[in-house]
UniProtKB/Swiss-Prot annotation:
Designated name of the protein: 3-phenylpropionate-dihydrodiol/cinnamic acid-dihydrodiol dehydrogenase
Family: Belongs to the short-chain dehydrogenases/reductases (SDR) family.
Gene (name only): hcaB
Alphabetized HAMAP family for the sequence: HcaB
Lineage start: Bacteria, Pseudomonadati, Pseudomonadota, Gammaproteobacteria, Enterobacterales
Alphabetical GO biological process terms: 3-phenylpropionate catabolic process
Keywords, comma-separated and alphabetical: Aromatic hydrocarbons catabolism, NAD, Oxidoreductase
Length: 270
C-alpha cells in the first residue's frame, strides 16, 4: 500500500499540464485528491474523468475566498488536509525589459505576480491551519527560472525567485509542524499560458518553444512530459520518505546545471 493511501492532497491548477499529471499520480497513489481550477471546462472534464476520486472546485488562485471555499469542502469530504501543492501559474513568453512597453510591463507584473506569488501566499494562508493540525506539508512548483536567467523574461524569472523566498520563509514560520518545499521543473509539454496584460492569455508555452529546442539544451537530451516530474512531489508529500526536508528546492532541470562550456553533455557519443 502506498504511503499516500487516504492522504488528503490539494493541488491548484489541476486541469492540465503538470497539475493534471499530479492529479493522476496522487490518485494512483491512493490519495484523496482535490483541485482548485480556473477553467469551468477543465473542472467538468476532471469530474467526468475521475468521478468520486476528485474534488474539483472552480475558482481563482488570486482570490482568498475561493481558496477558503475549497479548503472547507476538502475538510467536509476528508476531515483533514495532509498536503497543499501550489502549482497554478502563468509564463511571460520571454517578454523582455527593452521590448515591453512600460505600461504593459507594469500591468503584466501585477497580473503575473498575483498568480505566481500571491496565489501561493493565499493558498498557504488558507491551508495552514489544517496542515498545522495534521502536521502535513506544502509543496510549491518553481521552474528552472528560479535558478537561471533565460527561462522566461524578467517578470516570470523574478516571480519564481520570489517563490523561493516564500518557501524559505514559510518553512521557517511553520516549523516544526509543517514541512515546506519546492520542485523546479524544466520546460515540458504543457498548456502554460501568459498574462492577458501582455496579450498572451491565449498563447501556450508550446507555441513559443518546440520539443526539439527544449531537448537540445538539456544534457539528458529528451523532451520531458509532465508525468516525468511527479516523483519529487510524491516523495516530498510522504511522511515516511520525507521526515527531514523543509525549505528545500529540488531542481528537476534534466541536467541544466551541469551543462558544459564546450558541449551540452560530454557523453553524447557514448
Amino acid at each position: 500500500m502506498s504511503d499516500l493511501h487516504n492522504e488528503s492532497i490539494f493541488i491548484t491548477g489541476g486541469g492540465s499540464g503538470l497539475g493534471l499529471a499530479l492529479v493522476e499520480r496522487f490518485i494512483e497513489e491512493g490519495a484523496q485528491v482535490a483541485t482548485l481550477e480556473l477553467s469551468a471546462a477543465k473542472v467538468a472534464s476532471l469530474r467526468q474523468r475521475f468521478g468520486e476520486h476528485i474534488l474539483a472546485v472552480e475558482g481563482n488562485v488570486t482570490c482568498y475566498a475561493d481558496y477558503q471555499r475549497a479548503v472547507d469542502q476538502i475538510l467536509t469530504r476528508s476531515g483533514k488536509l495532509d498536503c497543499f501543492i501550489g502549482n497554478a501559474g502563468i509564463w511571460d513568453h520571454n517578454a523582455s525589459l527593452v521590448n515591453t512597453p512600460a505600461e504593459t510591463l507594469e500591468t503584466g507584473f501585477h497580473e503575473l505576480f498575483n498568480v505566481n506569488v500571491l496565489g501561493y501566499l493565499l493558498g498557504a494562508k488558507a491551508c495552514a491551519p489544517a496542515l498545522i493540525a495534521s502536521e502535513g506539508s506544502m509543496i510549491f512548483t518553481l521552474s528552472n527560472a528560479a535558478w537561471y536567467p533565460g527561462g522566461g523574461g524578467p517578470l516570470y524569472t523574478t516571480s519564481k525567485h520570489a517563490a523561493t523566498g516564500l518557501i524559505r520563509q514559510l518553512a521557517y514560520e511553520l516549523a516544526p509542524k509543517v514541512r515546506v518545499n519546492g520542485v523546479g521543473p524544466c520546460g515540458m509539454a504543457s498548456d502554460l499560458r501568459g498574462p492577458q496584460a501582455l496579450g498572451q492569455s491565449e498563447t501556450s508555452i508550446m507555441q513559443s518553444l518546440t520539443p526539439e529546442k527544449i531537448a537540445a539544451i538539456l544534457p539528458l537530451q529528451f523532451f520531458p512530459q509532465p508525468a516525468d516530474f511527479t516523483g519529487p512531489y510524491v516523495m516530498l508529500a510522504s511522511r515516511r520518505n520525507n521526515r527531514a526536508l523543509s525549505g528545500v528546492m529540488i531542481n528537476a532541470d534534466a541536467g541544466l546545471a551541469i551543462r558544459g562550456i564546450r558541449h551540452v553533455a560530454a557523453g553524447l557519443d557514448l
